[in-house]
Amino acid sequence: MGVSIYYSATRNSLLTTTEKDSFNNLVNKLNQSFPYKNEAETLNFYEELSQGFILEGSTKLPLEDEAILMESIEYWLEALSQLTLSLSSADWIVNIEDSPASWVNDRWVMQWNQPKDRLDSYRVLA
């Protein structure tokens, strides 16, 4: 079983063609810059969306190595921060499994009380 980051956005209007193009260019840039892009998943936005969403997606995290896991979490939270800022008119939700990320000072952060315990529980799932 894996652990994933889930992300979604809602707003009252659909994305314009210009917004879609700009957003997709940023997604491609972020995916290409991910240091483990050949070994792990990158940003994956779903083509079929749930009602009311303008974006939905997920990225499976690499669980084999704790250092790579932590680096990946940091990278994807920063990447999602950039995407959130690029579509600031949308309401975003970011979770790692059932743990919500918090939007603090223009960036997504995880605020676990006991990060090592959380990592250990993810390792058990692998």
Show where each model-derived region lies:
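Charged interaction segments
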Residues: 30, 41-126
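N-terminal low-complexity, intrinsically disordered segments
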Residues: 21, 33-44
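Short, extreme N-terminal segment that most often corresponds to the first beta-strand
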Residues: 1-27
